[in-house]
Amino acid sequence: MKNRKALALIAILALVAVACGGADEVVDEVEVETTEAPATTEAPATTVAPSADPLVLASLMPLSGDLASLGPGIALGAALAVEQINAAGGINGQPVVLIEGDSGCDGAVALTSLNDVIAQGAQGVMGAACSGTSLAILDTAIAAEVVMVSPSNTSPQFTKIDKKGFYARTAPSDLLQGDVLASLLVEDGVQTVSIISRADSYGRGLAEATAAAFEAAGGTVKTIVYHATDATEFSSEVTAVGKGGAEAIVGILFPETGCGVLQPAFEQGLLDTPWYMTDGVKDAGLASLCGLGTALDGFKGTAPGSAAGEAKDAFEAAYAGVSADGSPTFIFAPQAYDAVMLMAISAAANGVTGPEIASG
């Protein structure tokens, strides 16, 4: 007979798929009716002996660096998942432990934090946020047999590398976002575009995917300008984008360095050109962060979303209950929730913690 706490956990885990599907995907709902057989006829069940150790997970989000304005909101999605799991009885009869670490959107910072959380017993990591950061620390996680599930790694590069079964992501590849962004440009009647992008795995992957999809749809890419991720001055890159003379500009940026791009763009009069942004700057506070007031009004963009339905509604109600401002969601917070739930499902299903989580 199943433990009632396990049934409660299953109800919580039904929220998991909030972010894994696209807006056009339909998930069939299946009702399962359960009944208890009489004691005299109940067949013996095969069970897995639960681990005596608690499930220890780590949240490795950018609490400093270029994505610091997004990190806490994403991490809150993971914390919400742990809170709900523990309210339902935990995993294998014990509360899940969540350790918070800072990835800094920087390989060196993230590696230090990863080693620290591993030393504290972390068996799974929700993170990192930045694609390049995850690429920098993945080999260390694999060597330690620690599962990494990222809520926001969108670089197409992850599809190509050998992850040894210790890496997954709950956000879609930018091959999809590039196609959607190109479609948006075409729908708006844009025929020529210039792109300014970060020179990292995220930026290059999305810029190339967008350019390929836009050209396949009959558009023309005037120029692609990449900026160094550690740069502090971007005027020359902005000037180069402006010289392209395109009808629209695509910005594949992060908040802090993105402000370094948008400020000279404002000074050079380029913000009068239609801009299309991506998930890296999906932050309601971007204009304030950049000190640009209403200059960004009218910008359009793309970002991974969640399929409409009961699961999405339930997540947003729960997230609003724990967020400081009552916001129902935050970019990649649903995917962070899913990442933790997936690791928890594996641990619960297999009655284990540690490297065996990867087999789930």
Predicted feature locations:
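Sec-dependent N-terminal signal peptides
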Residues: 7-14
